[in-house]
């Protein structure tokens, strides 16, 4: 017998245009449904997310609905699909995380006990950790919920936490030169898609969404190799140290589009926690 949920799914799939809010509502209604129904809705949501149709806010909510259902695009650093092979202009041969590290990954890092394992922390990180509240505690209150959807990039992590996560997975943080090289490519692009900056191509303050989006939601913010969100969504901790400060690429949902171009940079204290600052992994291949 066909359920109301499946009937609604069929209606939306056959509609001439995509109603993003309706799709997001369908995703929310699927929570608690049968395994077969969840899988059908999840597959349909991924198909819409991987397109470009729909208003920004509707797509934001669609991505969050997928995150709560279980986003099949996500995997961990131990899986080959997590990484994208890239060769930079200087000949460096790298494997780079397709997306920023997500909330789902960070939750697993904490739940597995790896966050508490001192072997993953540098001496500076241990000194910082002794006086700091851990990420999971800060991410637990109800008011943090809009920023802790599983398929959103993790935010609110300090540089020390990002460093520890990377070390635990046999990786490190990108350098400023590497981040620029990934965005610019051999063509010396100012943005992952080329030039000029275009409205709706990256998740910057102009989108007026007020929080991070699911990773990979902005389909144009993508390099030819398949790296997502290098211009916007969340700013990126980089490995470069300047005394007590660390360099970041500042392009994010909370900053204007001028912060998203390849050569943009900022410096913040290593202990900074911000709702628009995340990180991405890299390793040599």
What are these regions, as identified by a protein language model?
Residues 138-266, 270, 275:
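Functional-site microenvironments in short loops/helix caps that host divalent-cation chemistry
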Residues 5-16:
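Alpha-helical scaffold domains
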Residues 276-285:
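Short, structured beta-strand segments at or near domain termini in extracellular proteins/domains
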Residues 26-37, 41, 101, 109-118, ...:
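Short capping motifs at secondary-structure boundaries
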